[in-house]
């Protein structure tokens, strides 16, 4: 499930393209404005000197002014066309994002029915601003007294920073615990007594920096959420150096920049399910420096699911049948299977309803879907092509021209000879 990495790679050049086009658009706008100012000045001089000159001079000046006005109008029309091209470019990437989201949602629903609704509802709850809970009793003082540097105020500031850091790190644990409450309430009483129970009592006076993600225990129903997070980090670590650095940085910034106010106590019983193997896998993946290509790391879901279900059924009681899907997903991460089986084309296709007004691309005259490649010829009438329609299986190196433009360039070359 590398839809995020693929989409980030696709829009990597988008900011530069937009910046170049906006710069060109701004230059054209300045050119039109300067032309209009000069024309207004010429019109004023024309009316001032019209009575003094002959009719032939007036006709000549009038024709020259009209010609310059039409040229300014053409420049303005070109600027509007450039703005429309920018709009189409952004709209094409937005539609691609919607398609990738639909594919990812269908994969999640195939593994755990109803999990996307829980994730979306939890995301809305976290996005809703809540009243911050003040766990540190800081006395109110005047503005001048607040600026004084004393040990007590310094200690409060340090505790607040540590608490903020702890809240961002505990986001994954809170997501999985709440999702397991809503989705797998009936599974908790059926787990065998051999599972590990961990109780966490967090106090504000304790050093919060000792919090370790490897000690987290999550509910059985939250296996899909934890699996998705671990797979994202794992796939990022398996990417090439350039993409891995940017993706990991984006993942860390997403956790650090979100200050979620967790006013509730984090002391809760685990759902009698041990995820130490999963947490250790996540920790090892964060520090790994594997440089294998991310596209070759996709596993076959059917083989992984069957193998993990067999191993989990041998070590669990028969009452785990209702929770076998989540436990199998968690067990899958702990074994790190190395066999990579490409997905079939039928699994990658999504039943997507297209807008009849959506632009058409490629030689097949269809809408944008899947992987597409752009022709480097600026005058290409089609511009974007599907990989399969032009016989490509991966991104071409260097400049690439479509079959029509290639044939046209060959014809022009033969004429010059």
Swiss-Prot record:
One Gene Ontology term, aspect cellular component: Swr1 complex
Compositional bias of kind Polar residues: 177-187
Extent of Basic and acidic residues compositional bias: 156-165
GO function terms (MF aspect): zinc ion binding
Residues where Zn(2+) 2 binds: 375, 380, 402, 405
Any GO BP: chromatin remodeling
PHD-type zinc finger segments: 359-408
Pfam families: ING
Keyword annotations: Chromatin regulator, Growth regulation, Metal-binding, Nucleus, Transcription, Transcription regulation, Zinc, Zinc-finger
Main location: nucleus
Site residues (Histone H3K4me3 binding), renumbered to this chain: 361, 372, 376, 384
Biased segments, Basic residues type: 136-152
Annotated localization: Nucleus
Sequence segments annotated as region (Disordered): 126-165, 177-198, 284-320
Binding residues for Zn(2+) 1: 362, 364, 386, 389
Biased composition (Low complexity): 189-198, 284-294, 303-320
Domain commentary: The PHD-type zinc finger mediates the binding to H3K4me3.
UniProt function note: Component of the NuA4 histone acetyltransferase (HAT) complex which is involved in transcriptional activation of select genes principally by acetylation of nucleosomal histone H4 and H2A. This modification may both alter nucleosome - DNA interactions and promote interaction of the modified histones with other proteins which positively regulate transcription. NuA4 may also play a direct role in DNA repair when directly recruited to sites of DNA damage.
Family: Belongs to the ING family.
Self-association state and partner proteins as the record states: Interacts with H3K4me3 and to a lesser extent with H3K4me2. Component of the NuA4 histone acetyltransferase complex.
Protein known as: Inhibitor of growth protein 3
Higher taxonomy: Eukaryota, Metazoa, Chordata, Craniata, Vertebrata
């Amino acid at each position: 499930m590398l839809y995020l990495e693929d989409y980030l790679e696709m829009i990597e050049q988008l900011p530069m393209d937009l910046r170049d086009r906006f710069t060109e658009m701004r230059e054209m706008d300045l050119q039109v404005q300067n032309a209009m100012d000069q024309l207004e000045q010429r019109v004023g001089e024309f009316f001032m000197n019209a009575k003094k000159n002959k009719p032939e001079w007036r006709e000549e000046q009038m024709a020259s002014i009209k010609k310059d006005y039409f040229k300014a109008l053409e420049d303005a029309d070109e600027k509007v066309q450039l703005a429309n091209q920018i709009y189409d470019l952004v709209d094409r990437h937005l539609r691609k994002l919607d398609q990738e989201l639909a594919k990812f949602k269908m994969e999640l629903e195939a593994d755990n029915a109803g999990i996307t609704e829980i994730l979306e509802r939890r995301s809305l709850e976290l996005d809703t601003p809540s009243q911050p809970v003040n766990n540190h009793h800081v006395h109110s003082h005047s503005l001048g007294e607040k600026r004084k540097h004393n040990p007590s105020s310094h200690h409060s500031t340090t505790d607040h920073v540590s608490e903020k850091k702890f809240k961002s790190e505990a986001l994954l644990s809170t997501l999985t615990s709440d999702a397991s409450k809503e989705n797998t309430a009936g599974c908790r009483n059926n787990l065998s007594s051999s599972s590990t129970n961990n109780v966490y009592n967090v106090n504000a006076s304790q050093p919060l920096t000792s919090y370790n993600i490897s000690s987290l225990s999550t509910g059985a129903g939250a296996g899909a959420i934890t699996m998705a997070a671990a797979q994202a980090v794992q796939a990022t670590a398996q990417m090439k150096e350039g993409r891995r650095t940017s993706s990991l940085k984006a993942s860390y910034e997403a956790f650090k920049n979100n200050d979620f106010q967790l006013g509730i106590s984090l002391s809760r019983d685990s759902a009698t399910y041990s995820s130490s193997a999963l947490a250790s896998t996540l920790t090892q993946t964060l520090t790994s420096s594997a440089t294998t290509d991310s596209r070759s790391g996709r596993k076959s879901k059917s083989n992984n699911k069957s193998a993990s279900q067999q191993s989990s059924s041998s070590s669990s009681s028969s009452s785990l049948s209702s929770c076998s899907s989540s436990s199998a997903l968690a067990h899958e991460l702990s074994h790190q299977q190395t066999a990579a089986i490409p997905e079939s084309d039928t699994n990658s296709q999504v039943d997507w309803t297209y807008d009849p007004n959506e632009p058409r691309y490629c030689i097949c005259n269809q809408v944008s879907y899947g992987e597409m490649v752009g022709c480097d010829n600026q005058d290409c009438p089609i511009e974007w092509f599907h990989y399969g329609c032009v016989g490509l299986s991966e991104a071409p190196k260097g400049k690439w021209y479509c079959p029509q433009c290639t044939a046209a360039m060959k014809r022009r070359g033969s004429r010059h000879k």
